[in-house]
């Protein structure tokens, strides 16, 4: 995808991870990464590259099967995602959906 990229700041608990990612994907976006700020190590980034519901399902299954905590668990749920949308209109739709769900943090 080569479109509009934006870094968004979100906050939620581990239980809301799937809903957050699907909100982005179902509204036409791609989730490239997740980044958290650590007091000692600085920014810690995990590559995601999620483009479909199947990608999200596989990611969530891996997290469950490995009993892994989401990266944002070390930052009180605050994290950023680099997301991408094919058009500015779709990016706006994604942001409005995230805001409606209470995921955006400012």
Annotate each language-model stretch with its function.
Residues 1-2:
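Minor-groove-contacting beta-hairpin "wing" of winged helix-turn-helix DNA-binding domains
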């Amino acid at each position: 995808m080569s479109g509009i990229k934006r870094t968004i700041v979100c906050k939620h608990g581990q239980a809301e991870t799937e809903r957050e990612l699907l909100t982005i994907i179902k509204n036409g976006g791609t989730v490239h990464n997740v980044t958290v700020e650590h007091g000692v190590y600085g920014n810690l980034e995990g590559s995601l590259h999620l483009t479909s519901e199947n990608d999200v399902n596989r990611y969530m299954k891996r997290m469950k099967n490995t009993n892994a905590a989401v990266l944002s668990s070390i930052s009180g749920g605050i994290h950023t995602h680099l997301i991408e949308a094919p058009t500015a209109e779709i990016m706006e739709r994604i942001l409005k959906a995230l805001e409606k769900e209470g995921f955006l943090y400012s």
